[in-house]
Amino acid sequence: MTKTIKLLTYNVFIRPPGIKNNENDWKDERIECLISDSLSPHINYNKGSKSAQGIPNAVYSVDKTSFPYIPYFSPWKYPVYGKLMEVTGMNKKAKSPPPPSSLKQQNLHNNSSDYQSIAPSKSILAQYDIICLQELFSAFSYRQRRFIEKAEQQGFQYYATSPSPPYLRSTFLVDGGLTVISKYPIVASDFFLYEQGVDSDMLSSKGVLYTKIKVVPTGSSNDDENFIHLFTTHMQASYAPKSDGSKTVKASATQDQASNYKNDNIRLIQLNQLREFIFEKTFKDKSIIILAGDLNVNGRVSKDDPKDGDSYLQMLELLSNSDQRDLPTGKKIFTIQDLLRDDFNGEHPPTVGDIKFLKDKKQEIPLETVLTNPNDFGCMKRLDYILLFNREFETSIDGVELNFKVPSPTQPSKHSQQHNSISPLKGSTKVDPFFIQGFPFTQLSDHYGVSTILQINK
């Protein structure tokens, strides 16, 4: 039996109320577009074409006549959902009032006969089977809760979220914003709280959310090949002071790395904590290990060079080698496979701050400016990842003793090919930009998503 599972990681940029990059970030409208099952979403493909960076030229459209009026006291923010459904026309029996004039249509691309329209599923996100979300915060609004309720109605019967911080015992103001929704059973979950961040990140209880998912529901619970270990995280961002020394903002790709020393140092600590947490959760069995999320590490050398950057190589080194005292110093415990990089021939497509060229193809401008922080306009960073961790050790029968094997330089480690029943489908990993037309925003987040297809042979 062969089946496939579609996995997505996506920083959805649904921050707590009042926190935004620009004048308006349209939180409720974007989340409605993502998860509503009444908008009849379609994807308009331009004959499979891609940008110079390899981003698919695919634009979503929804039925604007079915789009609900979203008042200030929106059900996405406040717990009066039932009443508002009747008042705002979200009830199917009532006629929806027209969208406010501020929701004027802005097309990202021209519609033409070159486009092929496909209906992906009930909602934009329902086309996936397992979704890792970052920046879907629960603090001070009902957005995360309503999102999970709507997702459940579309087959995502299982979910896990990062917990609220211990408000009276910490300086954290909000949760970590992590959510996993799944159409397959989540049989275990856990959360590890990172070293506290700096700058504005110090207010968020960032960490890594772990879920163990049974992707072969009818299979034996004693068979490791029926499960995946899935980790999602959102790590310390890079910030730098404005030129006038005022509040911190996101650093541009061209700013000196020394100005971000504080941020980078915290992220290095978090990477070490992440590796040890992954090892702790996975060393007793042989189930496949996947890390998916916004690691805030730029994979590219620079804006114009899509090859492996120094920060990226350092990240892989830290995630691969353990510094535990009870293990050999510097011992490589994982070989890491970057699925997006592999399917892009060793290059890193941008997931934040993409660009487009004017008609003369000489002048480049930022592709998205409504949601993106101005400091990230045109930065062309690759921050979002789906990584496959292959063990470089074997567990003993009792799952305690470790037997390390050093692979031959000319022969790949047998552990890198240990998952015979579950494996990523070669060529399936891609950037999902979630472009949309008909709204003041042209993307559903300031980040692009990254998706892959897992193939199960049982």
Swiss-Prot record:
Pathway: Lipid metabolism; sphingolipid metabolism. GO terms for biological process: sphingolipid metabolic process. Mg(2+) binds at residue 135. One of its GO terms (molecular function) is sphingomyelin phosphodiesterase activity. The record marks 296 as: Important for substrate recognition. GO terms for cellular component: cytoplasm; extracellular region; membrane. The active site is at 447 (proton acceptor). Residues 91-111 are annotated as: Disordered. Its EC number is 3.1.4.12. It holds the Pfam family Exo_endo_phos. Its cofactor is Mg(2+). It catalyses: a sphingomyelin + H2O = phosphocholine + an N-acylsphing-4-enine + H(+). The keyword Lipid metabolism applies. It comes from the Eukaryota. Gene3D superfamilies: Endonuclease/exonuclease/phosphatase (3.60.10.10). Keywords: Hydrolase, Lipid metabolism, Magnesium, Metal-binding, Sphingolipid metabolism. SUPFAM superfamilies: DNase I-like. PANTHER family: SPHINGOMYELINASE DDB_G0288017 (PTHR16320:SF1), SPHINGOMYELINASE FAMILY MEMBER (PTHR16320). Catalyzes the hydrolysis of sphingomyelin to form ceramide and phosphocholine. Belongs to the neutral sphingomyelinase family. This is Sphingomyelinase DDB_G0288017. It comes from Dictyostelium discoideum. The lineage of its organism: Eukaryota, Amoebozoa, Evosea, Eumycetozoa, Dictyostelia.
